[in-house]
A protein has these predicted regions:
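Gly/Ala-rich beta-loop-alpha elbow adjacent to hydrolase catalytic centers
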Residues: 99-103, 107
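Short beta-strand/loop motif that positions the catalytic acidic residue
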Residues: 190, 196-198, 202
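Catalytic histidine neighborhood in serine/cysteine hydrolases
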Residues: 211, 215-233
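Catalytic active-site module of serine/aspartate enzymes centered on a nucleophile-bearing elbow/loop
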Residues: 228-255
Length: 255
């Protein structure tokens, strides 16, 4: 996996205006850690073809060099999503957030502070915690080790890539660990409707992430759909159509 060779424009911020009766409904799609906007572009194109206004931002530290992810503070991830949310709300009557992996934790953190602006949250294999004893010492480890092997491109469908980094930046992981702990504490505050997709064969995240979110989130309107034929980056995998269509119905019913 590497960002070289990505389709032109797929590693940049992407925005498209809506059309027809859905033109005033916006969808903000947030990619995962070490991933890129490319992992959300087909999803965004599908929704835009249905008339929805879409925004797929580059989360700071991504879509450039993996070393850049060792230089950012977690707050910049939240700020980027918040900025895009506020911009969408200027022209949209309803706004929904879609988060993949860490993009899920990122979306939840921001949504907790902006429930007046968010009408629904769609999560695809979301990350809300990192289990294991070693992660507690990641800040110390990051002082002597800059990176580890990549955890990206966990995709069952052959020949598909998310155009992310080919290394796992350790200082970036330390920031991610801090961020997810804060995001988890906010879960009980979130009353927004939630649709969560979970791959039963996910090699990147433990199922406890899904269980924690569904158990601890404050929303009474929450749905879970299991994906039987996809790995972690399910938005690019065999079950993508299931995600796209069910997300469309979720948005349609609430707008």
């Amino acid at each position: 996996m590497a960002i070289e060779g990505a389709p032109q424009g797929w590693l940049s911020d992407y925005r498209a205006k809506g059309s027809g009766s859905n033109a005033d409904v916006g969808v903000l799609l947030v990619h995962g850690f070490t991933g890129s906007p490319a992992s959300m572009r087909p999803f965004a194109h599908f929704l835009n073809e249905k008339g929805y206004q879409v925004s797929v931002p580059v989360i700071p530290g991504h879509a450039s060099r993996w070393q850049d992810l060792n230089k950012v503070h977690w707050s910049s991830w939240a700020q980027k999503v918040e900025q895009e949310l506020v911009e969408l709300k200027k022209t949209c009557r309803k706004v929904f957030i879609v988060g993949l992996s860490m993009g899920g934790g990122n979306s939840l953190y921001v949504a907790a502070d902006h429930q007046d602006k968010v009408d629904g949250i769609i999560l695809v294999n979301p990350m809300i915690h990192i289990p294991g004893l070693q992660i507690k010492f990641v800040s110390i480890i990051s002082k002597v080790q800059k990176s580890r092997a990549s955890v990206g491109d966990d995709i069952k469908k052959p020949g598909v890539t998310e155009w992310g980094y080919d290394a796992l930046p350790i200082k970036g992981v330390a920031q991610l660990y801090k961020y997810l702990k804060l995001a988890r504490k906010r879960l009980p505050r979130i009353k927004t409707p939630v649709l969560l997709f979970h791959s039963v064969d996910d090699h990147t995240l433990d199922v406890s992430n899904t269980e924690i979110i569904l158990d601890e989130i404050g929303s009474s309107d929450k749905q879970r759909i299991e994906l039987l034929n996809s790995y972690h980056v399910a938005t690019l995998d065999y079950d993508a159509d299931i995600i796209f269509e069910n997300a469309r119905l979720f948005i349609q019913e609430r707008s």
